[in-house]
Amino acid sequence: MWINANLASLTAQDSVVLANNRQVLAFKKTWNLQRGTSALPQTFAWKQYLQNTWKAINPNSSKRLISAIESRTLINQSMTRLGQIVDTRLLDEVVKNMDYCHAHLINPTQLLDSHHQNSELFSAWMLDYQQTKLTLNVLDVNDLSTLILNRDREISQPYLYGFKTLTPEQSGLFANIGHQVLSANQPNTHSSNQTFNTTSDEIFHVATWAKDLHSKHPEKHIAIVSPQLNSEHHQIKSIFDQVFDDVLVGTGQKAYNISLGLPLTDYPFIRHLLSVLQLSQQLQSNRISTETFNAVITSPYIAHAQVEQSSRALLVNQVLSWSQTHFKLNQLSPHLINTPLLDALINNISSKAVSGRQKHDQWLLSFNTYLLAWGFATDRTLSSVEYQLFNKYQQTSLGLNQLAQINDKVSASQAVVDLQTWLSQVIFQAQSAKTPIQILGSLEAEGLYFDEAWVLGMTDDFLPAALNAPRFIPNDIAAQHQIPHSNFELIAKDAKDTLNNLINLSDQVNFSYAKTHFESEQHRSPLLPFNNEIETPKQPHQPALLETINDTQAAPLVDKQVSGGVGILKDQMACAF
């Protein structure tokens, strides 16, 4: 993975601003290939450049730069303060529209003057958020470009690479500072285009192509681009695992890498951790959720999980037999006789002093104490992914210290909810071994260069993109300020630029699309001709060899008296599984 540009004119004193973090990595690899051990220029993605430049020109600023998650929290508070019931989808849309307003230089007064009810409401939220930042003496990343424009010192001109179209904010800033463009070498105008009957056929063919190519040329870097990687992730992973025989191989050792992170809260390890914190709070308040209790005591991550595995499973059956959503500790205690180690853990947690309302940083200390008391992640050796997740949790949970600066005291249950919300905003992907086969989305693939490349899913749902105007910005204002996908002219230009970037992923790029996806009909992108239809041979399915055992004869039963059958049936009926 490289960028297709000549870096001979750059020196260690230069700075380079790239469109995204993956291009930053590709730039460093390209520099090492072209310039060897020469000192590397400073390289930044766009937001990193803003933060680094602001800190350089304001080293002693009294204002604190808040993170994106802190910013979301303050926006949420502003919306709630103005009477809005906030959910995650609404907050995501509001944050996206605020980013549009800053990037495309839309003033809140324009929205107020539009006389659209949604726009007026959104403008009120934005103004309240701005006032909140002034009160707290903080900044977010959207404030930095204006501060840099009003600087009192000179800034060296950066090189730019990988930007399809500069936003008005970026254009204004770089016009003020001055810049040079690091041009990409994009000579290709043609590609090999193929059609398949189903997406399964398409993915299977591409996986086979990648495997064969890798076996013949293991040194080649191969890119497989899927515009719908989020929705097709599991299908792609399943088929590639079958083709590469990687079903039982851990993430870090697979022959390929899928570049798709998930929110921390989507990982079972983190869900177990949060359940432990919830149960700790419930034990202290003496109102225990059956669902949470059963999830925690059967967790493989708490202390002595392997030693008491069977007896804890039986305890789950006992708790389920009560048919209660919640229960108290005195109801549970008589049944802990067969799980003495678990009994000691529960008594240790429940006997701790009950904390009332505290600041978030104090709750973080309490949470760490709970995890230590439960012996979380100590009963067995963690896998590589689990180890990375635990480290990421420990780093991310420090965000509660930041919440303590902008929030009042909260209850234990609210602190757990806030921690869960914070973790859900952090996208995590475990580091894997270096592999030459990369499966990635179209946005992060643009601007990169590989030895071989294949782009899946070239349907009319992908290129050109559908009209998608912002929810809180009127259509005329969105089109006037050139917000992406807000009118057909912008969509057509973006589609042309995207196709040009994808065609130049390699010297020879394959494009393909499938006629059907899970029984839904699909149509090709009108930007490319598809005349070569591939008939994918049916995948051979051979039944597994079965070993037959002659069980018509057996040893005679010595003791024909049967007892305890009622108890066995009772246990089976009580079992949830």
Regions found by a protein language model. Name each.
Residues 2-43, 47, 54-63, 185-577:
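Anion-coordinating catalytic cores for phosphoryl-, nucleotidyl-, and glycosidic chemistry
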Residues 122, 180, 508:
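Residue-level detector of anion-binding/catalytic polar loops
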Residues 10, 21-154, 168, 311-327:
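Basic/charged alpha-beta structural segments of nucleotide/phosphate-handling enzymes
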